Design a protein with these regions (language model features):
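Conserved hydrolase catalytic core segment
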Residues: 96-127
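Short, hydrophobic/aromatic-rich segments at coil-to-beta transitions
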Residues: 1-7
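Generic hydrophobic, aliphatic-rich segments that mediate packing or membrane embedding
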Residues: 45, 49, 82-86, 101, ...
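Catalytic nucleophile-loop/oxyanion-hole region of alpha/beta-hydrolase
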Residues: 71-83
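A structural signal for short coil/turn segments at secondary-structure junctions
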Residues: 54-57, 93-95, 117
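Conserved acidic catalytic loop of the alpha/beta-hydrolase fold
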Residues: 80-98
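Conserved HGGG/HGGXW glycine-rich cap/lid loop of the alpha/beta-hydrolase fold
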Residues: 7-71
Length: 127
């Protein structure tokens, strides 16, 4: 099964790559410092883990702005810019409440998002 990659645009006009797999309560998997959805999905261990999560959740994966299949013209690398992309993604997907997983460098902006929007975050997990 190929990962069904889609794109959306943030309010600032950045084109962001994302994918959703599975069914159930939403879980947003925030990317590491560098991400590439197609290359991640090519790794059997990652793919197997995501499929396991997708057995119980709608898993949302995305490439950071500036990485992978997302636009590469990023100039603002602040955590606030990452929060803005996360806000735009969950708004685009119309997710009212969801769990957040912050992997590596995405930890700070997942925490910042949860602090700003506690009514939307059901759980937060940092790796």
């Amino acid at each position: 099964m190929d990962l069904p990659i889609r794109f959306f645009s943030t309010p600032s006009g950045a084109r962001i790559a994302y994918a959703t797999i599975g069914e159930g309560p939403p879980l947003v998997w925030c990317p590491k410092w560098i991400s590439h959805l197609e290359r991640l999905w090519a790794h059997s261990a990652f793919r197997s883990f995501m499929r396991t999560l997708a057995g119980r959740h709608t898993v949302v994966l995305y490439d950071r702005y500036g990485c992978g299949l997302s636009d590469r013209d990023r100039t603002d690398c602040s955590p606030a810019a990452d929060v803005a992309v996360l806000e735009a993604l969950v708004d685009h997907l119309e997710l009212a409440r969801f769990a957040l997983v912050g992997v590596s460098a995405s930890g700070p902006h997942t925490i910042a998002y949860a602090a700003r929007h506690p009514q939307r975050v059901t759980h937060i997990k940092r790796q």
